[in-house]
From Swiss-Prot:
Main enzyme class: hydrolase
Protein name as it appears in the record: 5-oxoprolinase subunit A
GO BP annotations, alphabetical order: carbohydrate metabolic process
Matching Gene3D superfamilies: Glycoside hydrolase/deacetylase
Family membership: Belongs to the LamB/PxpA family.
InterPro entries: Glyco_hydro/deAcase_b/a-brl (IPR011330), LamB/YcsF/PxpA-like (IPR005501)
Catalysed conversion reaction: 5-oxo-L-proline + ATP + 2 H2O = L-glutamate + ADP + phosphate + H(+)
Domain of life: Bacteria
Pfam families registered for this protein in UniProt: LamB_YcsF
Record text on subunit structure and interactions: Forms a complex composed of PxpA, PxpB and PxpC.
Main function: Catalyzes the cleavage of 5-oxoproline to form L-glutamate coupled to the hydrolysis of ATP to ADP and inorganic phosphate.
An MF annotation (GO) of this entry: 5-oxoprolinase (ATP-hydrolyzing) activity
Length: 254
């Protein structure tokens, strides 16, 4: 069995650093790099791309709403499809340019924060994100939350997709993530998370907060790099998967 581990990196800004990117880079097989709207800047983007190239890690754009103060986790009421297409295309293009400068190549796109959360449940937003990706480069892989509106949008646009589950997030009965505003939305116990990921990958399913089993395709597992103990959690997940015979490899190289 083959599985990818992805992580959101490059989410600092200026002198401020978020998480231990260097350590996470040695564990993840694909990384999603902030493109300046919710976090990141040209220097951090270049540094992150360069590290990824050195580790043989695939890179993707991680576009979000323009919201540095809110880290891209706040919705933007009234935003239009055209505005979403523009901001997504802008951020993909920014990372492509920085990647070219560093001698690496962007392979995928994964929406960040509120943009992703809204797109998972709203057809217009999901289709706008997919349309922007297709317009910039139809060969880019669209990372989608399994069983969400993003899957429908990716299929309609004819994009290759990597279906994602989250190692440290809990799920509602409809397959969407429990809101971070609710208690228990984010898990922190490294051993529990590792065991949970192994079950998800082996069974092709997640278990919701009420115990409902939700079958889904799983190509990649997201491990957040900005939570307490992130490096230990990521290392534990990878070790647990490999001990059970999984090959951890970038989805872009399968």
């Amino acid at each position: 069995m083959k599985i990818d581990l992805n992580c959101d990196l490059g989410e600092g800004y200026g002198a401020w650093q978020m998480g231990d990117d260097a350590a996470m880079m040695s564990i993840a097989t694909s990384v999603n790099i902030a493109c300046g709207f919710h976090a990141g800047d040209p220097d951090i983007m270049h540094k992150t791309v360069t590290m990824a190239k050195a580790h043989g890690v695939s890179i993707g754009a991680h576009p979000g709403f323009r919201d540095l103060h809110g880290f891209g986790r706040r919705p933007v009421p009234g935003i239009t499809a055209a505005e979403i297409e523009n901001l997504v295309a802008y951020q993909i293009g920014a990372l492509q340019a920085v990647a070219a400068l560093a001698g690496h190549k962007v392979t995928h796109v994964k929406a960040h924060g509120a943009l992703s959360n809204v797109a998972c449940e709203d057809d217009m937003t999901a289709r706008a994100v997919a349309a922007a990706i297709k317009a910039v480069d139809p060969k880019l892989i669209f990372v989608v939350l399994a069983n969400s509106k993003l899957v429908d949008a990716g299929e309609a646009a004819g994009l290759a997709m990597a279906h994602e589950v989250f190692a440290d997030r809990t799920y509602e009965d409809d397959g969407n993530l429990v809101s971070r505003r609710k208690p228990g939305a984010v898990l922190h116990d490294a051993r529990e998370i590792a065991q949970r990921v192994v079950r998800m990958v082996q069974d092709g399913a997640v278990v919701s907060v009420t115990g409902k089993i939700i079958k889904m395709r799983i190509d990649t597992v997201c491990i957040h790099g900005d939570t307490p103990g992130a490096v230990d959690i990521a290392r534990g997940v990878r070790l647990a998967l490999e001990e059970r015979g999984a090959t951890v490899v970038p989805f872009a190289r399968r």
